Amino acid sequence: MVNMKASMFLTFAGLVLLFVVCYASESEEKEFPKEMLSSIFAVDNDFKQEERNCAGYMRECKEKLCCSGYVCSSRWKWCVLPAPWRR
């Protein structure tokens, strides 16, 4: 049973490696690893840290006001989404 699991895992890993090698050889750009990693771990603009006058989601709202669409939680002092029980 263990040998069958190991052979299936090695077969699957080999197929994945074969796919990556074939895709890399067909790609004309030399920046393939960097491009592949950046597409896998793409960061949306909403998640980037930016300097602004208001506090975003789950940020402290003691000194800054929350951005539009968020309210300051009276219990935790974080900016959170408004909900009926938080009004």
UniProtKB/Swiss-Prot annotation:
Propeptide: 25-52
UniProt GO cellular component terms: extracellular region
Comment, domains: The presence of a 'disulfide through disulfide knot' structurally defines this protein as a knottin.
Family: Belongs to the neurotoxin 10 (Hwtx-1) family. 51 (Hntx-8) subfamily. Hntx-8 sub-subfamily.
Subcellular location: Secreted
Keyword ATP-binding: no
Regions crossing the membrane: none
GO terms of molecular function: ion channel inhibitor activity; potassium channel regulator activity; toxin activity
Pfam families, sorted: Toxin_12
Lineage: Eukaryota, Metazoa, Ecdysozoa, Arthropoda, Chelicerata
Protein name (database record): U3-theraphotoxin-Hhn1n
InterPro entries given in the database record: Huwentoxin-1, Huwentoxin_CS1
KW Secreted (keyword) present: yes
UniProt keyword list: Disulfide bond, Ion channel impairing toxin, Knottin, Potassium channel impairing toxin, Secreted, Signal, Toxin, Voltage-gated potassium channel impairing toxin
Disulfide links within the chain: C54-C67, C61-C72, C66-C79
Summary of the function given for this chain in its UniProt record: Weakly inhibits Kv11.1/KCNH2/ERG1, Kv1.2/KCNA2, Kv1.3/KCNA3, and Kv2.1/KCNB1.
